Design a protein with these regions (language model features):
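Post-signal-peptide N-terminal segment of Sec-exported extracytoplasmic proteins
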Residues: 40-64
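Beta-sandwich interaction modules
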Residues: 62-73
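C-terminal motif of bacterial Sec signal peptides marking the signal peptidase cleavage site
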Residues: 14-15
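One face of beta-strands
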Residues: 19-37
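Short, solvent-exposed aromatic-acidic interface loops
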Residues: 36-44, 176-180
Length: 210
């Protein structure tokens, strides 16, 4: 099981959680990335699951194990050429986990994201002929789809992508996209249940004003 899959497994026992991915991407291909996994709306249930250590036969990582996984991410990401300002944080009062880093190319961005799940090497972001593309692959355990009794909870849980650029956006391929007034930020949100069943719902191709 990958590192942040371990954290998201807590969703099996939580009524609500939020995953927010933010990118500030510049024309020179550098940028800043952040990922927030937020269980604060159901912190009591999440804390109970962590304290039990096992629910419905599934092992729940301890707080110490979560800290270790975040530390391992920092170590792995620091070895990626072109990655910098790598940081993680955790809040065990509300169960909020964050990771942040900067990158000097999309290759570096992809390489850092691939340290989260070492079993696969994916191209998460690319730019072709001036079009910025996101090929979504969020680290949510596939086995959640088998938990039909959790469907309602997972429909309440949300994944949000917020991408900001230093030039104006002219169009976005995903019809669920919303734009800021400045036309430099695109927003996309879906519930976790739908994304589990179709990861492509979070895919997007973003074009810019010449």
């Amino acid at each position: 099981m990958n590192k942040f899959g371990l954290l998201l497994l807590c969703a099996l026992f939580s009524s609500c959680f939020q995953v927010t991915e933010k990118i500030t991407h510049r024309t020179n291909q550098s940028g800043d990335y952040s990922l927030v996994i937020d269980f604060s709306d159901s912190w009591i249930k999440t804390r109970a699951a962590v304290m039990l250590g096992e629910v419905d036969g599934e092992k729940i990582p301890s707080e110490a194990e979560m800290k270790q996984k975040l530390a391992q991410f920092r170590s792995d990401a620091s070895k990626v050429k072109g990655a910098s300002k790598i940081s993680t944080s955790y809040n065990f009062s509300n169960y909020i986990f964050k990771l942040n880093f900067s990158y000097n190319s999309l290759e570096a961005l992809n390489a850092v994201l691939n340290t989260i799940d070492k079993e696969t090497k994916l191209v998460h972001f690319k730019e072709v002929n001036g079009v910025f593309e996101r090929v979504a692959s969020y680290p949510i355990p596939e086995k959640l789809k088998e938990k039909k009794d959790k469907k309602e909870d997972l429909e309440e849980a949300k994944i949000t992508a917020v991408y900001t650029f230093d030039k104006q956006i002219s169009a976005a391929q995903n019809t669920n996209s919303k734009f800021s007034k400045s036309k430099k930020t695109v927003f996309l949100k879906h519930n976790v249940w739908n994304v589990l069943n179709d990861n492509s719902l979070m895919n997007n191709s973003i074009s810019f004003t010449p």
